[in-house]
Swiss-Prot record:
GO CC field: cytoplasmic vesicle membrane; endoplasmic reticulum; endoplasmic reticulum membrane; Golgi apparatus
Protein name: Probable protein S-acyltransferase 15
Catalytic reaction equation(s): L-cysteinyl-[protein] + hexadecanoyl-CoA = S-hexadecanoyl-L-cysteinyl-[protein] + CoA
GO terms of biological process kind: protein targeting to membrane
A GO molecular-function descriptor: protein-cysteine S-palmitoyltransferase activity
Amino acid sequence: MGFVYYVTLFVFIDDWVGLQSSAGKLNALLFSLLASLCLFSLSICVLVDPGRVPASYAPDVEDSGWSNSNVTETRKCDKCFAYKPLRTHHCRVCRRCVLKMDHHCLWINNCVGYANYKAFFILVFYATVASIYSTVLLVCCAFKNGDSYAGNVPLKTFIVSCGIFMIGLSITLGTLLCWHIYLITHNMTTIEHYDSKRASWLARKSGQSYRHQFDVGFYKNLTSVLGPNMIKWLCPTFTRNPEDGISFSASRDS
């Protein structure tokens, strides 16, 4: 991230319009804002606990199936030897159960789960926007200074290498962003997506249609992660919602 920030400001913007110009200052300010939002989102992903099962948690036996508004399931972790709520999984790296676990992310050295999934998604969003923005600035810089770069082999090699890197980074982050948009709009975690493949195959085999049990509709799926206030959707701080990480609204209740 530090390398991308440095070359964007002191190479791409400076060589294109100059950092002291009005356009240069504006672009530097906008990119610095994006970089700050990335760092803020990253810090939340790293520092916030993804979701710990309460020590006092015990499933309600009478509510072990479908209820009026929520679904729960009695399950016990064979590693923690404790009850774990629905959508909770045991992380082999963290060596504990995580509420609504999506995956363990090596880049943040933390699990992505109920309490920090929004921050992770917003981090990917801002990082994608920043990488595309940097790539556009690189292209503008290259078009303006193409002739001068052509006569300087080391500089030309550096610019081309940066272009390959930034395009690859933008495609990678953009793909990751699209993937998590898909998961959010279907109210799935990464783990549940792969689990649902078999369920979907079995449903088709028996001539039935399959719908993920927590898919409660496009808008409700979005608000379950991003929160009910649209103004705060791009703020990475965790937004409390009616779900508590232990019980969740189910599709047959929607």
